[in-house]
Amino acid sequence: MGSEMCIRDRNILGYRPYADDVVDYFVQKSISNGIDIIRIFDCLNDLRNLQEAVNATNKFKAQEGRGEAQVALAYTLGDAYTLEYWTSMAKKIEEMGADSICIKDMAGLLVPYKAAELIKAMKEVTKLPIQLHTHYTSGVASMTYLKAVEAGVDVIDTAMSPFAMGTSQPATEVMVETFKGTPYDTGLDQNLLAEIADYFRPYRDECLANGLLNPKVMGVDIKTLLYQVPGGMLSNMVSQLKEQNAEDRYYDVLKEIPKVRKDLGEPPLVTPSSQIVGTQAVFNVLLGERYKMATKETKAVLRGEYGQTVKPMSQEVIDKVIPGEERITCRYADLLDNEMDKLEGEMKEWKQQDEDVLSYALFPQVATDFFKYRQAQQEKVDMTQADTKNGAYPV
């Protein structure tokens, strides 16, 4: 295994859909800067949104001999998400040219025996390596990994013990010890792993002390299994209700979430669909009328800008929220013009290296502030104080 990064389909690391030429350039520069595996997922599991990143990875691999495209399927529950659905997706991923598959269980919903069933079924239809990524939020992740490994999964994602468990992954050391002396023995040295854990433990303590790491995310939250809601989505929902002095409506919102999810075509609850569904559920409850106010993201989902959902969206909600609007049935990126030349022109005064344009594309305000800071450090001139129009600088 080499270094790996995760990108969100055509949104890459940002918050809007980017044209294909931006996706292509980002993948190229990621691999040339040392990333070996590009893990690509889509919040709707719409494979059309992933094809360009897979193509870009394969193109660079053909040229340079490096880079692996791993397509991640967002795991979720619902009557549409059958074994046949998952095996069909696995076959399509192999056909689209991916090098491996990741089952991305962001909410910790995949329980042990279902994991074994899923892995066995997918292994029967694809020769691609399968990697499993889950979270300990619901408390079953280690057992899920055990059954998945026994069923033939190729790779499991873990975290070093100081930052494991809770909303993170099972501890690396625990899984290494679990498989020691079995056909699945990793061969990893526990003494060396202990040194790594000792290195990171003070950072964990520092994060706890300064509030960067909330103790609440370090335990088990069984509500994840009951409501099928990822831990991060619950935290975000609580914050929204607290801001509105409406924490007493918590369970009302929890009941509304599956209704909104159904209205929007039953998408997996993963970034950004989890935030879209959660925020809309809060609005529906607090305003006393469903879809009295719809967020711009909810409208975009209903228009089809995010892609195709596994089930049809509610026509009643479509008629109420975006009455008379034309809906998109093609891949949304097909409607976008290439952007690289435009982006290069907008930030040319700051460009010092090729990667700068990608920083600007993904995080324009943050990147611009950094470019100004970098120039100030290099030239000892604070551009926020300079009067560039009159060529003056305060002394």
Show which residues each predicted segment covers:
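Catalytic alpha/beta core domains of metabolic enzymes, predominantly
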Residues: 106-291
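Short, small-residue-biased leader/transition segments that mark boundaries at the very start
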Residues: 1-7
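General structural feature for long, well-ordered alpha-helical segments within catalytic domains
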Residues: 22, 26, 46-49, 53, ...
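Terminal or standalone catalytic/regulatory effector modules within metabolic enzymes
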Residues: 214-224, 228-395
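Alpha/beta enzyme core
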Residues: 11-12, 16-132, 145-153
